[in-house]
Amino acid sequence: MSLGSTPSTPENLNPVTRTARQALILQILDKQKVTSQVQLSELLLDEGIDITQATLSRDLDELGARKVRPDGGRAYYAVGPVDSIAREDLRGPSEKLRRMLDELLVSTDHSGNIAMLRTPPGAAQYLASFIDRVGLKEVVGTIAGDDTVFVLARDPLTGKELGELLSGRTT
């Protein structure tokens, strides 16, 4: 069975074992982003396998397939641990913020419900603007100077906890 074969007609439908069917499902999910069970059943039919929705649901469940929705993208079926599922597809604003903080954050401090982020000269406004656009639920807003960003924590979070969250450290 190969992907991209001629469309199936009733004469060329293949009887197939559950194991072979599930192996083909894994192969299809590995090669392309499948966004619905209808799409997957059509792809299986193209390979000569006619399957009911109930059987397909059961197969997906047994394979541990789940829908993954990348930030700003369309959900698709994936199999395996989240870390091994097309990591680049899961990189949305939050992942970009993590990378940006890793690159720009020099140090953190805090007072009350304010986290103070120190950056290299000239980077604070860029970082603050991105924090605002990401829309973290823990953040009320930001104020930036040249190399310092004040980030106001939303209650009940403290400035210390917010600084730890943003810096990736926990104590």
UniProtKB/Swiss-Prot annotation:
Where, subcellularly, is it found? Answer: Cytoplasm
Q: In which pathway does it act?
A: Amino-acid biosynthesis; L-arginine biosynthesis [regulation]
Q: Name one Pfam family in it.
A: Arg_repressor
Tell me, in a sentence or two, what this protein's role is: Regulates arginine biosynthesis genes.
Q: Alphabetically list the UniProt keywords.
A: Cytoplasm, DNA-binding, Repressor, Transcription, Transcription regulation
What NCBIfam families does UniProt report for this protein, alphabetically? argR_whole, PRK03341.1
InterPro entries, sorted: Arg_repress, Arg_repress_C, Arg_repress_C_sf, Arg_repress_DNA-bd, WH-like_DNA-bd_sf, WH_DNA-bd_sf
Where does it sit, as one GO cellular component term? cytoplasm
Record family assignment: Belongs to the ArgR family.
Which GO MF term does the entry hold, naming one? arginine binding
Q: Where would you find the membrane-spanning parts of this chain?
A: none
Coarse class of the protein's main subcellular location: cytoplasm
Q: Which GO terms describe its biological process?
A: L-arginine biosynthetic process; positive regulation of DNA-templated transcription; protein complex oligomerization; regulation of arginine biosynthetic process
Taxonomically, the superkingdom here is Bacteria
Provide the protein name. Answer: Arginine repressor
